[in-house]
């Protein structure tokens, strides 16, 4: 089954988007890369309160749009958390009558990057396949516990 249209979102290196775009064009597939907006209007409204709305990654913006829409019936403020290459935690403030504000958030290294940087930066750390422990008693468990704790 061949897609008729692709709607994508990427914050990867431009070469990734270029390669995908070329593939779509070569196969006659219509495509559109979505970008962050100053506001979203649908079943609910989400206002982008970033100093420069265009600097907010489209991945974070559309995760916020999806979360606000999915939780619309709850009428509550939200935290939207992504864990991948980076871990992001974003605050979505519920105002009234289906209106939300994207207030901003935090970005840190994701678990894989943390582990990679630790092994490259501290050559003596060779075995990092530890487990989470409330009070680790081995270096590998201490590293894994620290990485997991840093995500929350």
Q: Language-model features: where?
A:
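Short beta-strand scaffold segments in enzyme catalytic cores
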Residues: 78, 87-93
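Nucleotide/phosphate-binding catalytic cleft detector across ATP-hydrolyzing
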Residues: 1-79, 97-152
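Active-site glycine-centered loops adjacent to acidic/histidine catalytic or metal-binding residues
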Residues: 84
